[in-house]
């Protein structure tokens, strides 16, 4: 494990190893606000070693500037931050929320289930002890970022994400391919006003519940950096509160922009509270999972009243976005009967079973406006679930999938009428040639609301490697316009992921998201690539490791064959060795050119002429 660690004690058990400390050669830097001067927007600064000009002890050096990269790891990678997991993270947004004067504190939790959990003495050892009173919008108020944006207000959250997206890379914009953005409108510099306008148009969201003040704001939208989500959560057979908190911290260390808690096991309420109070990123949930647990796993026993109470419970805890499968309509369920793999979404199957058991329309659909009323009182964003997504490439782009998408477009308009932020979930399993159709239809049907996809997986033949099969689809659909990608781990379809699987999934999806940013031509996206390529050409091995997405693995792979410290300054690697390194040969040509005072092309031709003469002098024999 990188860095130092801290311990968390819950119910008498101590978890050692909450991931702390910066990544190699990295430090946290903070960019101040302009419209809101109190802002401190975190970036990760990666230092570089100097370039040596020539060889030998007298060789001169020229400095290489540090590289700034997006950082979602929160205070956990800042050695100066004093953290106590039992107290939770500092309430970064508290003064912003209070300063708007449109919310009020409740005397206590208002959900029936929340009150019951607080009154249960058996849970005393599990509870997060330092919980703030939940807040809610004042009567008649709307506290969503979409509402503020439509009123022309640039909130601190909006300026925060604008500064975060720019990465201080203005100087590097010239050294970048223009990209193909498929109709996106990515500006050269992202301003707070651009952020406000994108949110007002529904093309981007800032998931930021007023009861999650610990959150460092981030934005999800087609015209911004492609984001990734990591799923965590306990089950009936495995995991604990301690492990889920560590999974969250571990996920964001490696680059997860949001985290979904998909717990289905014991103590879901308490687990979620611990995660939220220590999470600097948006936390999403699927409320129907907890509602189902409350009725003993019997979908037919679900009721609107129980689900409504679950929504309020989670809103008051601070959940930032809900996956709600309101598009699974009774009339669509028969369309899945002839599918190869039927309904594979857990939430979709729950609602389909309820619809069939009662032969009534999905209560999430019939009560959708009431759900909007709840969510706008806390600024919880919709992630409209694709309950009928294809679970195999054979079922991709069928009538059930696209019928549900049409309904999600209808629901998007209703949510926007209430100024509730919305993103749309997408597939799934889709072969490469059918991927772009998904993006094109979603943009047209859902009014350009952000698209959030699981992959998609591009083939079904690789259990154990589905992070790879889905990473292919994720890179493609991210390029076409998807705003956030939900990671897939190597354990997909096989089991619950462990720490190593989580890291593998996150980094795979960071690669996919970054590849999409490059292809779209996002301003500054290429700066890190250029820096690493320059380090590679100059044999600055430490910089190659440190600039990579996974410095630990890069270093370990290098050291498997060349473990000596001297190998980290050598002008070759184990792939080609010292005699056949193409970059070393190119450098020798450049050195020759510099000594002779000629161009690289002239030097190269001179070297070729020299080798030609040697060949002829040796008898012009191909094999000797």
UniProtKB/Swiss-Prot annotation:
Cofactor note: Binds 1 [4Fe-4S] cluster per subunit. The cluster is coordinated with 3 cysteines and an exchangeable S-adenosyl-L-methionine.
Keyword Metal-binding: yes
Keyword Chloroplast (UniProt): no
Record EC number: 4.1.99.17
Keywords noted in UniProt: 4Fe-4S, Iron, Iron-sulfur, Lyase, Metal-binding, S-adenosyl-L-methionine, Thiamine biosynthesis, Zinc
Residue sites binding Zn(2+) per the record: 429, 493
Residues reported in the UniProt entry to bind [4Fe-4S] cluster: 573, 576, 581
Cofactor(s) essential for the protein: [4Fe-4S] cluster
Gene Ontology biological-process annotations: thiamine biosynthetic process; thiamine diphosphate biosynthetic process
Substrates-to-products reaction catalysed: 5-amino-1-(5-phospho-beta-D-ribosyl)imidazole + S-adenosyl-L-methionine = 4-amino-2-methyl-5-(phosphooxymethyl)pyrimidine + CO + 5'-deoxyadenosine + formate + L-methionine + 3 H(+)
InterPro entries: ThiC, ThiC-associated_dom, ThiC/Bza_core_dom, ThiC/BzaA/B
Binding sites annotated in the UniProt record for substrate: 231, 260, 289, 325, 345-347, 386-389, 425, 452
GO molecular function list: 4 iron, 4 sulfur cluster binding; carbon-carbon lyase activity; zinc ion binding
Pathway: Cofactor biosynthesis; thiamine diphosphate biosynthesis
GO cellular component: cytosol
Pfam families cross-referenced by the UniProt entry: ThiC-associated, ThiC_Rad_SAM
Subunit field text: Homodimer.
Family according to the record: Belongs to the ThiC family.
Biological role stated in the UniProt entry: Catalyzes the synthesis of the hydroxymethylpyrimidine phosphate (HMP-P) moiety of thiamine from aminoimidazole ribotide (AIR) in a radical S-adenosyl-L-methionine (SAM)-dependent reaction.
Name this polypeptide is given: Phosphomethylpyrimidine synthase
Organism: Myxococcus xanthus (strain DK1622)
